[in-house]
Amino acid sequence: MKIAILYREEKEKEGVLLKEKLSREHEVVSFHEASASNVVDADLIVVVGGDGTMLRAARKAADGTPLVGFKAGRLGFLTSYTLEEVDQFLEDLRKGNFREELRWFIRVESDIGSHLALNDATLERDLSGKMVEIEVNVEHHSSMWFFADGVVVASPTGSTAYSLSIGGPIIFPECEVLEISPIAPQFFLTRSVVIPSSFKVTVECQREINLLIDGTMVGKTRRVIVQKAEKYVKILRPIKYDYVAVIREKLGYGRRIE
């Protein structure tokens, strides 16, 4: 098996350690993420970092190439192992003891280009700007209007990212839905809505505001169209991986108070 190890530049030590252990049984190439080509040619991509590194690695992976993440960041929702679990990973790799989890991208079209996001597309005002009137149209339905600082359109993967911090729900990754969440709306009863992923979402603002793709600023625009993309990433999980346990541990959600 050909394995590529992708790591943040400041995590080179951890990347080298993984390479040494994996090289005993597999062909291994390794590089820090900034030096990686657009598409990584390998049977498996091992990522050392946090969710940001996993997001960037997902874009570099060819369709169908699985990723497995080792947590070397803060939360690590997308990672599957800690750096102390390398031996367990090697054992799982030998026996094929993994579950496959498919995470799909959203496509964001605007006058400044076409982008893929695994988490979310965000339209938001400058810090010094005024609130914005925003029209959101869900395909086959009439429009909704918000007077707010912006709006987030998120995939299930993105439901535990920015969207969660502005009051959006946690969505299980297997769900085929999109989530629309206004940012700091004027009316406190305005809440997130969840729609089928088969519908396109058109967002139009009264003026140009910032467009962010997975938290990265790509420019200013007034109008975007968001829909589920055909591209997906395959993440390998240990057989005993438990999503509820992850959100309980990392977010404190549903934790029993003794």
Swiss-Prot record:
Active site feature:
51 (proton acceptor)
Offer a single GO CC term for the protein.
Answer: cytoplasm
Q: Give the keywords, sorted.
A: ATP-binding, Cytoplasm, Kinase, NAD, NADP, Nucleotide-binding, Transferase
Per the record, the domain of life is Bacteria
Enzyme Commission code: 2.7.1.23
Q: Which cofactor does it need?
A: a divalent metal cation
**Carries keyword Protease?**
no
Q: Name one GO molecular function term.
A: NAD+ kinase activity
Residues the entry annotates as binding NAD(+): 51-52, 56, 119-120, 130, 149, 160-165, 184
Where in the cell is the protein located?
A: Cytoplasm
Its GO biological process terms?
Answer: NAD metabolic process; NADP biosynthetic process
Catalyzed chemical reaction(s): NAD(+) + ATP = ADP + NADP(+) + H(+)
Family stated for the protein in its record: Belongs to the NAD kinase family.
**What the protein does?**
Involved in the regulation of the intracellular balance of NAD and NADP, and is a key enzyme in the biosynthesis of NADP. Catalyzes specifically the phosphorylation on 2'-hydroxyl of the adenosine moiety of NAD to yield NADP.
> Entry's HAMAP family?
NAD_kinase
Which PANTHER family does UniProt cross-reference here? NAD KINASE
Q: What is this protein called?
A: NAD kinase
Protein's organism: Thermotoga neapolitana (strain ATCC 49049 / DSM 4359 / NBRC 107923 / NS-E)
Which gene name belongs to this protein? Answer: nadK
